[in-house]
Amino acid sequence: MTKTWPPRTVIRKSGGLRGMRTLESALHRGGLGPVAGVDEVGRGACAGPLVVAACVLGPGRIASLAALDDSKKLSEQAREKLFPLICRYAVAYHVVFIPSAEVDRRGVHVANIEGMRRAVAGLAVRPGYVLSDGFRVPGLPMPSLPVIGGDAAAACIAAASVLAKVSRDRVMVALDADHPGYGFAEHKGYSTPAHSRALARLGPCPQHRYSFINVRRVASGSNTAEVADGQPDPRDGTAQTGEGRWSKSSHPATMRATGRAQGT
């Protein structure tokens, strides 16, 4: 029997972990496993890396992550508790860090898609199917499906979102020590009023994305009250993508970015 795309009923959202298990279980029953979820964090930030994670959860391991949910709905404390559990129970996971300079050169959206491809390619276990959070990911060597609100609909995407969020937050805390005064540990590089004031006062640092309008205005000396917009320049984002990675030698905040659960 030829493996093919799942029927539309597979991607219907149901509440809670039960709904997350339903989606992946259907794919496994159809012979399409292992199923990988992929998600990103940091698209809208005007400073810091774009972080993309891919995660494979075996069908028998999702129950061990009862607290799993969309990372945006979880408190920082809950995410930190889930992070080591996901690393422990995941069949495989991989986290990719794309630095600000790379985002500027490639563009936010295209860098994000390339990051998703690289995250999937870095998995220690080759998935039979990939679920992405909202974005179609062309160029994957296996079938894939974008799921709107995927981090609340599929456990593997939710797990990837937690891995990406915690990884990025830890990097931003370390960058706060490297670049004092911007408040990276608090706002994580997003365009809050406090960040905008610090940016206007100190000017951009190497971690800022010059493709974002507010950063470009400050850098050019034309800072205005609109500096808090924090949106990428629409003229950017059409070039090819690439990927940069943090390593232990290049940054103290970097953690083990690739994993495979023991005994798998």
Curated annotation (Swiss-Prot):
| Top-level taxon of the source organism | Bacteria
One Pfam family it belongs to: RNase_HII
Q: Where is it predominantly found?
A: cytoplasm
Q: Which reaction does it catalyse?
A: Endonucleolytic cleavage to 5'-phosphomonoester
Cite the EC number: 3.1.26.4
Cofactor, how bound (note): Manganese or magnesium. Binds 1 divalent metal ion per monomer in the absence of substrate. May bind a second metal ion after substrate binding.
Q: Which GO terms describe its biological process?
A: DNA replication, removal of RNA primer; mismatch repair
Q: Does the keyword Secreted apply?
A: no
Which InterPro entries does the record cross-reference, listed alphabetically? RNase_HII, RNase_HII/HIII, RNase_HII/HIII_dom, RNaseH-like_sf, RNaseH_sf
Signal sequence range: none
Q: Which UniProt keywords apply?
A: Cytoplasm, Endonuclease, Hydrolase, Manganese, Metal-binding, Nuclease
Q: Which residues bind a divalent metal cation?
A: 39-40, 133
Return the similarity comment: Belongs to the RNase HII family.
What job does this protein perform? Endonuclease that specifically degrades the RNA of RNA-DNA hybrids.
Name this protein carries in UniProt: Ribonuclease HII
